[in-house]
């Protein structure tokens, strides 16, 4: 009891009630404060308000035109052919990437001037045609329900980043577009670019997804707060055979370019080009053979033939061609006329006599007999 009473007395001596204390400044001895100290110094201090975000407002329709910016931002792709075995190939003529579903697509990021520290690279997919550009590009329901990946990327996102644990998958608050962001990395020594490995997780032909609608992938270089530093874009087709599709589309593209070139040529020049092209086509007439005889191609070729019968046939053809190089066209025409006359006689078409006399046929008796 004695100890508890002593503790109560100690508590009463050290406890300061709010009525007695008043303001906290009364607890401080005046001898420790300078004479010019103002106890109301903190009365006019305002509480700092949160600043609005410096990120630019997101456009409802993203711009896909190239913008290298002050840093000279551009993209590169590894060289690849059109073999059927390739899983990813890029066409510079079409500015189009052909790839298989969920296969690695390396894209090289190149800058002339290093961007600020903390810059990021953002990849966004949009539809190419104006009638579809307002829609969000997302995976089809079938692939969206398919379990794949490491679980870091949302199931609806078309574009994913491979081999980078710092990738962040975003969905815009304004237009709900999907994007994936990775930090910009300085190229390693001896290299002029940084490579990002992308995957496209749905086929272009999938119903309920892209549904054969062409898409563009926009790669943008941004600061950490979203300010645009550079932008590039390219078309993407996700298909089963990238090499075959690239070869077909490049062939069609070249044909279209040739047609457009002919359309730009005036009609008079076009007719002259047509005449020149038709005159260069080989014809079996004698005049053309005369031109062939004057050809400067004197090289001799050897052809191996199996079987004597074929050899005799090809030999006759060769002898005829050699003869046509020597015989003038007029003699050739005269020879053809003789062949036609002989052919008519063999068919029994005998000429009628000029003065009405009956022409006797073999084994036919005359009237006198």
Swiss-Prot record:
Region of interest (Interaction with DNA), ranges: 237-244
Cofactor binding note from Swiss-Prot or TrEMBL: Binds 1 zinc ion per subunit.
Positions of the UniProt region annotated as Transcription activation (acidic): 1-28
Gene Ontology cellular component list: cytoplasm; mitochondrion; nucleus
Cofactors that this protein relies on: Zn(2+)
Biased composition (Basic and acidic residues): 246-263, 346-369
UniProt KW keywords: Activator, Apoptosis, Cell cycle, Cytoplasm, DNA-binding, Metal-binding, Nucleus, Phosphoprotein, Transcription, Transcription regulation, Tumor suppressor, Zinc
Function: Multifunctional transcription factor that induces cell cycle arrest, DNA repair or apoptosis upon binding to its target DNA sequence. Acts as a tumor suppressor in many tumor types; induces growth arrest or apoptosis depending on the physiological circumstances and cell type. Negatively regulates cell division by controlling expression of a set of genes required for this process. One of the activated genes is an inhibitor of cyclin-dependent kinases. Apoptosis induction seems to be mediated either by stimulation of BAX and FAS antigen expression, or by repression of Bcl-2 expression.
Comment block on domains: The N-terminal and C-terminal disordered regions undergo liquid-liquid phase separation (LLPS) following homotetramerization and activation. Post-translational modifications, such as phosphorylation or lactylation affect the ability to undergo LLPS. The nuclear export signal acts as a transcriptional repression domain. The TADI and TADII motifs (residues 17 to 25 and 48 to 56) correspond both to 9aaTAD motifs which are transactivation domains present in a large number of yeast and animal transcription factors.
UniProt-recorded name of the protein: Cellular tumor antigen p53
Organism, scientific name: Barbus barbus
This protein's encoding gene: tp53
